[in-house]
């Protein structure tokens, strides 16, 4: 997903000026575009960065604020006005909103499709074959309270472990770049791997999957982008511009040949000049978002509401999926484009 907060890239003073009204800290460019601060992911291109490069934004300008690997931290930064928007696993989004943070999901941000997913790997010689074998053992995850933890606990529950037994499975937080090594050296017993880390680890051999998010829930959107409610109210045009552009960029990824996607990503990474390794792009497979245009569905949030209620982390009835998200800005949901059309609303060849 996204990487640890690093340095800030400021918009040049000649380009950006502080808005005299509206949400505190909101800036505009000299030509009146709203500046959207965000955190990215090193060595990769996010859908909204792609949207900017494709020219899909008309009313907004992105401003990079470093990288992060923690979805919960990313959306917390958005909720506390350090950023204009963030992205995280839907379970973390539900917890944030249920806890009183005034944010709303506006677009799916990641998921699992046929080619891209998260796998939970064990060594071939580990002797681990079932969920019960994990009792007393360690699972390496990128952060707590997010995708890897929820998927792991849900799989253990579905495999018949009691709450007490699940509590004996230890989650160990590790940087994604170190997780494979920790597995191979015996520091952990299961490694949550995705993207380039999954592909390179599998290529080296000696490991296999114990479970995957795709096998647990099928092709599914797992995360969303959120904006603060006050920002949505005061700058609806900017939010609408971000959503329509990013939704179209996601659709572009869904219908464009892989070689063209990788070439475009490489060009974007070279142009932004952050000294990143483009060699990882060869492992790109797909957007990971199965729904055309990243339209949000009730079930993608309700399933985690139910999970939190079942695990006594949320009171039943406190929130529903419809309290958490809106599709009103998404052109693939609001009638602007046919639901399965291309990035410009055109018919897509099958």
PLM region descriptions:
Residues 1-35, 340-350:
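Short, low-complexity disordered leader/linker segments with a strong preference
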Residues 59, 112-113, 215-217, 287-296:
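Short, solvent-exposed loop/beta-turn-alpha elements that line the ligand-binding surface or hinge
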Residues 68-72, 87, 142-147, 177, ...:
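Soluble non-cytosolic domains of exported or imported proteins
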Residues 91, 126, 177-270:
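Pocket-lining segment of extracytoplasmic ligand-binding domains
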Residues 233-316:
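Secondary-structure end/capping motifs
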Residues 305-350:
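Conserved C-terminal helix/tail region of periplasmic/extracytoplasmic solute-binding proteins
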